[in-house]
């Protein structure tokens, strides 16, 4: 769990610096370890959604947000719904 926490922190730092590709590299290996229905799984998916938005890959961001609608944490599924409403809005 300590490695996961340090990876999440490193991904957050990468996001803060605008290094979206590094964030994706850090988070992708964790996706298989944590279900989208768990708190940590939701948290890491929200991070990678933000990174995908940052690099302009809205399709991947939308696909992941759809998986988070069923997360057990209301804050995570609410954030996913908010992001979907923004991503699905006409431009």
Q: What do these predicted ranges mean?
A:
Residues 29-37, 69-72:
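Solenoid-like repeat scaffolds
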């Amino acid at each position: 769990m300590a490695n996961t926490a340090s990876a999440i922190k490193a991904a957050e730092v990468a996001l803060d610096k605008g290094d979206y590709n590094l964030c994706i590299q850090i988070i992708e290996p964790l996706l298989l370890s944590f279900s989208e229905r768990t708190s940590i799984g939701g948290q890491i998916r929200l991070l990678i959604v933000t990174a995908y938005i940052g690099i302009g890959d809205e399709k991947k961001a939308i696909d992941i947000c759809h998986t988070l609608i069923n997360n057990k944490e209301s804050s995570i599924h609410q954030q996913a719904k908010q992001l979907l409403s923004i991503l699905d809005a006409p431009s």
